[in-house]
């Protein structure tokens, strides 16, 4: 399930574009997540009241959380699968405090792919998309394994 060096390079190349403007990418990812899967909004007390895309775009809190999410994910992706130290506290908080089901990690992975396709159509071709999907699947599988260790059946 691991990625080749070439695949990791594709992932990190596109991630460089994300890091050039994390706030707008994070906002795009979260809006895509909430529009595609409105049930995920229920896990976010500070966003539950946001009903329209315009309200979401106007929310500084949402933008700030998008930065938090993508900054954490970027730190994990840069480890090229050697992300145990970064993953452990994330799995702990998402399993025990936030109670985020693994399925929701799949939903946000799809939202990340969608946001990258939308924002970087010329730089996110089939090879880069395939590599990013593999990297996000590796992340999700490792999160699921940590959830299991913590006794969370999310």
Curated annotation (Swiss-Prot):
Heme b binds at residue 94. The modification Phosphoserine is found at residue 4. The keyword Oxidoreductase applies. Keywords: Cytoplasm, Heme, Iron, Metal-binding, Muscle protein, Oxidoreductase, Oxygen transport, Phosphoprotein, Transport. One of its GO terms (biological process) is removal of superoxide radicals. It is found in: Cytoplasm, Sarcoplasm. The modification Phosphothreonine is found at residue 68. GO terms for molecular function: heme binding; metal ion binding; nitrite reductase activity; oxygen binding; oxygen carrier activity; peroxidase activity. It catalyses: Fe(III)-heme b-[protein] + nitric oxide + H2O = Fe(II)-heme b-[protein] + nitrite + 2 H(+); H2O2 + AH2 = A + 2 H2O. GO terms for cellular component: extracellular exosome; sarcoplasm. O2 binds at residue 65. InterPro entries: Globin, Globin-like_sf, Myoglobin. Residues 2-148 form the Globin domain. Its EC number is 1.7.-.-, 1.11.1.-. The keyword Oxidoreductase applies. Nitrite binds at residue 65. Monomeric. Marmoset, woolly monkey, and squirrel monkey have a minor myoglobin component that appears to differ from each major component in having Phe-Lys preceding position 2. Belongs to the globin family. Monomeric heme protein which primary function is to store oxygen and facilitate its diffusion within muscle tissues. Reversibly binds oxygen through a pentacoordinated heme iron and enables its timely and efficient release as needed during periods of heightened demand. Depending on the oxidative conditions of tissues and cells, and in addition to its ability to bind oxygen, it also has a nitrite reductase activity whereby it regulates the production of bioactive nitric oxide. This is Myoglobin. It comes from Lagothrix lagotricha (Brown woolly monkey).
């Amino acid at each position: 399930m691991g990625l080749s060096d070439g695949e990791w390079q594709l992932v990190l190349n596109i991630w460089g574009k994300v890091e050039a403007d994390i706030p707008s990418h994070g906002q795009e990812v979260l809006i895509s997540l909430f529009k595609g899967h409105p049930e995920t909004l229920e896990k976010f007390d500070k966003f539950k009241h946001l009903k329209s895309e315009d309200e979401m775009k106007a929310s500084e809190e949402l933008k700030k959380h998008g930065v938090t999410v993508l900054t954490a994910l970027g730190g994990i992706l840069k480890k090229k699968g050697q992300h145990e130290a970064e993953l452990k506290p994330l799995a702990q908080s998402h399993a025990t405090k936030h109670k985020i089901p693994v399925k929701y990690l799949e939903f946000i992975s799809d939202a990340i792919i969608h946001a990258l396709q939308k924002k970087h159509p010329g730089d996110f071709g089939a090879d880069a998309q395939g590599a990013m999907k593999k990297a996000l699947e590796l992340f999700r599988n490792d999160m699921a394994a940590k959830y299991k260790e913590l006794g969370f059946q999310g």
